[in-house]
Amino acid sequence: MNHGIRGAEADRDERFVKELCGRMGVPLTVVHEKVGSYAADHGLSTEEAGRILRYRHLKETAEKYGCAKIAVAHHEDDDAETVLLNLFRGSGLPGLSGIRPVRAEIIRPLLCVSRKEIEEYLTSREHSWCEDSTNKENDYTRNKIRNELLPWVTENINSRAAEHILAVSEFAA
């Protein structure tokens, strides 16, 4: 889904995905949304509006192709960020359980793999990938956790901090 937020960068990412799917013979459905307008019209954050629209389109596409499951690419680091975000927001035990590997038709097969491992795998096979530049901006609390807090904790306290955070989240599940 092209969120209508990142302009030329998003268009470049869309072309990349179209070319990759074409080379691999994978069917592709592309939709364009104006996430900012949807967020404003519905009183939502841009993040929440994007999530709602993304999952809506994923479900519609799965139905169109007769797919029972939708695999998304959340990984171990996303899960650790979610646990910390929920902890800091005071969500209690349910929030500490993190991202569920299976929720209805959504499956998350990469939750046991770190972002670093994914990047190393792609690099070892000489595959390129796209990165959303907004993930590096610290405009959102999640990004501050991703870009500042977790790297600091990993460097200064424990290099396996994400694993330990997720081990605690297992008890809350």
Give residue ranges: language-model regions:
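Core alpha/beta nucleotide-donor-binding catalytic domains of modification enzymes
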Residues: 1-150
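ATP/NTP-dependent adenylation/nucleotidyl-transfer catalytic domains that generate, transfer
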Residues: 140-173
